[in-house]
Amino acid sequence: MHTGIIGWGSYVPKYRIKVSDIASVWGKEEGVVKALGLTEKSVPAADEDSTTMAIEASRDALTRAMIDPREVEMALFGSESKVYAVKSTSAILIDALGLSKFSLTADLEFACRAASAGLRMAFSMVESGQVSYSLVVGSDTAQSNPGDVLELSSAAAAVAFVVGRAEEASAVVEASTSYVTDTPDFWRRDGMPYPLHGEAFTGEPAYFAHIYEAVNRLLQDTGLKVSDFDYFVFHQPNGKFPFQMAKKLGVPLEKVKQGMVSTLIGNPYNASALLGFARVLDVAKPGQRVLVAPFGSGAGSDAYSFVITDKILERQKLAHTTDYYIQRKKLVDYASYAKTTHKFKVYD
């Protein structure tokens, strides 16, 4: 392909709650927290949502891209936690960021994989010459039923990428593939405030099977081997699954660590694997190769092979790193977290 990532940006709210505090409120055993491999999760402020976070991440991505925002002719937004059930967030991005009003826009849905599906679409549209640049954003204030195990991991963050031609790219996409089946591991019906999950399906039938198939197909199609890659980034529903996935594929664990964000902030759904990818781009060197494999319940996985170019060196310095947002933090208690994430029902 002749396309790639030109600019990237991250955003993580500064508030955190200890996973052990959530577990304590609901009387969960210490072993439950330990099994997830998590310590803290990010919490949105009272005035933050998936739209505001998307704007923050996109500003950094556009800064790194070093282009006029009006040249962006496509905006795709992937999220499980849209502010409006019926109103386009991607249209809000057009005006908020000063993108071209003659743009193709869409809000995408496929659980945690929606933004990744958007990336494949963006690469194709730029490759075909139908648009010059595309903005793809994944942003979630992840939802979870109070007391459910999901509440221990569901977090908030956003990540954005500007896609353009290979000659301008910081990371050129070599190849991509997808693997999708009808697997009922996680769902939320219309009108339900929180998702449900079929625990028997969440591990092997969903996460592991789909990522394995997508990555294996990518390696077969390209003729590349695990040893050809410097970094691997997998979807991160918790702090353990990505390392188990690495072992299943024969990937050295050292190649996974830089792309891990869930161990630091929890699982921000659409900003999970892609935020890990942004964290890799913050430190990657020219010539290095990165494999990225997002996953979305329902279920599907994409796999990408990226090669880093020398253009990344200048752009790494132009905006805040992912770690900047991860490291600036303020702890809150469960009551504050429950209030800002609207866990309480208020009746007038």
Curated annotation (Swiss-Prot):
Coiled coil: none annotated. Its EC number is 2.3.3.10. Pathway: Metabolic intermediate biosynthesis; (R)-mevalonate biosynthesis; (R)-mevalonate from acetyl-CoA: step 2/3. It comes from the Archaea. CoA binds at residue 240. The active site is at 80 (proton donor/acceptor), 112 (acyl-thioester intermediate), 235 (proton donor/acceptor). GO terms for molecular function: 3-oxoacyl-[acyl-carrier-protein] synthase activity; acetyl-CoA C-acetyltransferase activity; hydroxymethylglutaryl-CoA synthase activity. (3S)-3-hydroxy-3-methylglutaryl-CoA binds at residues 29, 112, 153, 202, 235, 267, 297. HAMAP family: HMG_CoA_synth_arch. Catalyzes the condensation of acetyl-CoA with acetoacetyl-CoA to form 3-hydroxy-3-methylglutaryl-CoA (HMG-CoA). Functions in the mevalonate (MVA) pathway leading to isopentenyl diphosphate (IPP), a key precursor for the biosynthesis of isoprenoid compounds that are building blocks of archaeal membrane lipids. PANTHER family: 3-OXOACYL-[ACYL-CARRIER-PROTEIN] SYNTHASE 3 (PTHR34069), ACYL-COA:ACYL-COA ALKYLTRANSFERASE (PTHR34069:SF3). Interacts with acetoacetyl-CoA thiolase that catalyzes the precedent step in the pathway and with a DUF35 protein. The acetoacetyl-CoA thiolase/HMG-CoA synthase complex channels the intermediate via a fused CoA-binding site, which allows for efficient coupling of the endergonic thiolase reaction with the exergonic HMGCS reaction. This is Hydroxymethylglutaryl-CoA synthase.
